[in-house]
Amino acid sequence: MAMSSGGSGSGVPEQEDAVLFRRGTGQSDDSDIWDDTALIKAYDKAVASFKHALKNGDICETSGKSKTTPKRKPAKKNKSQKKNTAASLQQWKVGDKCSAIWSEDGCIYPATIASIDFKRETCVVVYTGYGNREEQNLSDLLSPICEVANNIEQNAQENENESQVSTDESENSRSPGNKSDNIKPKSAPWNSFLPPPPPMPGPRLGPGKPGLKFNGPPPPPPPPPPHLLSCWLPPFPSGPPIIPPPPPICPDSLDDADALGSMLISWYMSGYHTGYYMGFRQNQKEGRCSHSLN
């Protein structure tokens, strides 16, 4: 009996120690699993030390700069600079050719001075060949460049040709029998120094984005072909007429307008083929009814 009591007495404290140790560690794990107080304190300490270092550095830099700032030279040089700028402003006259920076894209285009306000040191320029009027500072005007003007005029002409080609292709897509093999849109060889010129008001090609554009609503899908009154179509027709593919889009100028144009062209072609198929099926039904009556 003594041995059994001694054994049970010696075993109880071991079990109690084990249980107490497990409960303690379990509670501490559950309570500290989402506790990030130490991390927040470390972050705040690092930010505070960084701000303190920056503040001390700024004070040192400002004090160093104040000691080493050079003295200004006499105002004679400033007067000479003012004379040079005044002379450069006075050289422009109404009707002079120049090159100006268009505010829409920040590129240089040839222009002509329409009016000058010497008090405000501004002028109104008209971009050559396009009619866009814009107010510019006289100090911002550049000397005219003949080669740039020629390239801009040539690009504008090719730009108009591309817009004409796009309208021709949209008309050809409405007539099933026309072929578009002979229509080849020209790729505008833009100068690497300049983007396309600014556009005229209205639906035209935008500056800096060469290629075909799709402005306005899509063309309405054509109606299905009329019923052949007394003609019986063969049971296996040759298929729908050839539709010209949508105009190519330059991969360098892909944007929302290009994606929208491609979607509208696909929608238009899908509507045409759907109408053709529905008309063909209706012709087949009418032909079968006429044969059954006969």
Swiss-Prot record:
Cross-linked residues, Glycyl lysine isopeptide (Lys-Gly) (interchain with G-Cter in SUMO2): K51, K209
Protein's gene:
SMN1
Residue span of region Required for interaction with RPP20/POP7: 97-209
Q: What is this protein called?
A: Survival motor neuron protein
Q: Where are the annotated segments for P2 (binding site for SM B)?
A: 240-267
The answer to whether keyword NADP applies is: no
Superkingdom field: Eukaryota
Bias regions of kind Pro residues — which residues?
Answer: 194-204
Q: What spans are recorded as compositionally biased (Low complexity)?
A: 156-166, 206-215
Q: Where is this region: P1 (binding site for GEMIN2)?
A: 13-44
Species name: Pongo abelii
